Amino acid sequence: GLFSVVTGVLKAVGKNVAGSLLEQLKCKISGGC
């Protein structure tokens, strides 16, 4: 139902945010920003 849709959206957003943070960390560590 609606709850499962909301949960799916939150999980997708969380993955995107985590991915962005990981990319920024890799960038800073490698010094290639």
Curated annotation (Swiss-Prot):
Give tissue specificity per the record.
Expressed by the skin glands.
User: Can you list the disulfide-bonded cysteine pairs?
Assistant: 27-33
TM annotation in the entry: none
Q: Which UniProt keywords apply?
A: Amphibian defense peptide, Antibiotic, Antimicrobial, Disulfide bond, Secreted
Q: Name one GO cellular component term.
A: extracellular region
Main subcellular localisation: secreted
InterPro entries named among the record's database cross-references: Antimicrobial_frog_2
Tell where it localizes: Secreted
> Which purpose does this protein serve, as stated in its record?
Antimicrobial peptide.
Q: What is this protein called?
A: Brevinin-2CDYb
- Which species? Rana dybowskii
